[in-house]
A protein has these predicted regions:
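Residue-level marker of positions within ordered structural domains that often coincide
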Residues: 17, 31, 55
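N-terminal beta-strand motif that seeds the catalytic metal site of vicinal oxygen chelate
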Residues: 1-24, 35-36, 71-73, 120-127
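Vicinal oxygen chelate
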Residues: 1-5, 9-17, 38, 46-51, 59, 62-88, 105-110, ...
């Protein structure tokens, strides 16, 4: 088996409680593209791969032997405000409203699985 072309050298791997609901969230907020879902015999998600904003994220369903393990994620995007609004509308909690920073337009929210999403438009020039 060869490495999928959408893999990058480093990718986040989260363990979430309620992986099917997490999929609905990332599809609604980021228009995430499904690449792979492998299910356990009980139909829970053993492993999933999705493309978010051009990059791959990987995750699986939490279990007794695999407790939830969230991650901070950074997205370089030109639509900071739009993604922030979509995150909040889909149950995330804002912890940095969209604002202009010396490094670009930025915002942040925490999803209900404990993942921190940082949104940044690095090409923004505040001058």
């Amino acid at each position: 088996m060869s490495i999928p072309e959408y893999y990058s050298p480093v990718m986040p791997y989260m363990v979430v409680k309620g992986a099917d609901e997490f999929i609905k969230f990332i599809k609604a907020v980021f228009d995430a593209e499904e690449k792979l879902i492998v299910r356990n015999p009980d139909a829970s998600i053993m492993h999933a791969e999705f493309i978010v904003n051009g990059g791959a994220i990987l995750f699986g369903e939490a279990a007794e032997s695999w407790p939830p393990f969230p991650a901070p994620l950074y997205l370089a995007t030109s639509i900071v405000d739009e993604l922030y609004k979509q995150g909040i509308a889909n149950g995330a909690t804002g912890n940095m409203e969209p604002q202009d920073k010396e490094y670009g337009r930025a915002a942040g929210f925490l999803d209900k699985w404990g993942n921190q999403w940082w949104l940044n438009s690095p090409d923004y020039d505040p001058k």
